[in-house]
Amino acid sequence: MTKLITTVKEMQHIVKAAKRSGTTIGLIPTMGALHDGHLTMVRESVSTNDITVVSVFVNPLQFGPNEDFDAYPRQIDKDLELVSEVGADIVFHPAVEDMYPGELGIDVKVGPLADVLEGAKRPGHFDGVVTVVNKLFNIVMPDYAYFGKKDAQQLAIVEQMVKDFNHAVEIIGIDIVREADGLAKSSRNVYLTEQERQEAVHLSKSLLLAQALYQDGERQSKVIIDRVTQYLESHISGRIEEVAVYSYPQLVEQHEITGRIFISLAVKFSKARLIDNIIIGAE
């Protein structure tokens, strides 16, 4: 049965005992409202580690002033039930006051990796992500930590953070988990209207169009961006906020495509902002 831990002190006590006995720990950092994408990461951890910890913490530092912190779905009882079914050992669900007992004396600034794409539209977002992930790594001391490739920029930033701060953890990127029709699973999908849900499938279809263009030899980013944008404009009512081509994981905007890239989309529907991406090309 999955154990619910609600304080940093108790979590650290468990971790210290586990480390003394040579136990391996896997961590899946989440903000809750779990879906099959999260559960895929839990299953991967359970198959690899002696102890699997799922953190459920809605981190206020990664929400902007006009974003949905208060409205973000919170369903800890359901989350606990879901991860129990797939074998998680611990759900770490601390209070904000426990994670941030006072004003932070040191600000974490990510730098150039956070100046593009999602980071450019949400200033300070990735500073908040890196702050909380650093704290979780220090509290849980995982051997492996699992992140979804759906948030590809976040994954690249966390991998750089691990390198820069010498964290003794291996980051495992998990492929995007999709609905049967191709829509990337997301906690925010519940905000879509019935019509928007039908339209949202075209995000993944537009990425498959981009992949086909690349496979046919197209290497001009503008051509791919224009074709994807045209496709989306003719199939969705949401506002297209971004269609971009960047190197991966360096996150440098590409004009003439060389090497590994990721194509990123962001679309704003009435009450949900959806992102999706595809990573293609040689490393």
Curated annotation (Swiss-Prot):
Catalysis: reaction(s)? (R)-pantoate + beta-alanine + ATP = (R)-pantothenate + AMP + diphosphate + H(+)
Task: Specify the protein name.
Answer: Pantothenate synthetase
Active-site residues annotated for this sequence: 38 (proton donor)
Source species, please? Staphylococcus aureus (strain bovine RF122 / ET3-1)
Binding positions for (R)-pantoate? 62, 154
EC number in record:
6.3.2.1
Complexes and interactors: Homodimer.
Chain sites annotated for binding ATP: 31-38, 148-151, 177, 185-188
Q: Where does beta-alanine bind?
A: 62
Which PANTHER family does the UniProt entry name for this protein?
A: CYTIDYLATE KINASE/PANTOATE-BETA-ALANINE LIGASE, PANTOATE--BETA-ALANINE LIGASE
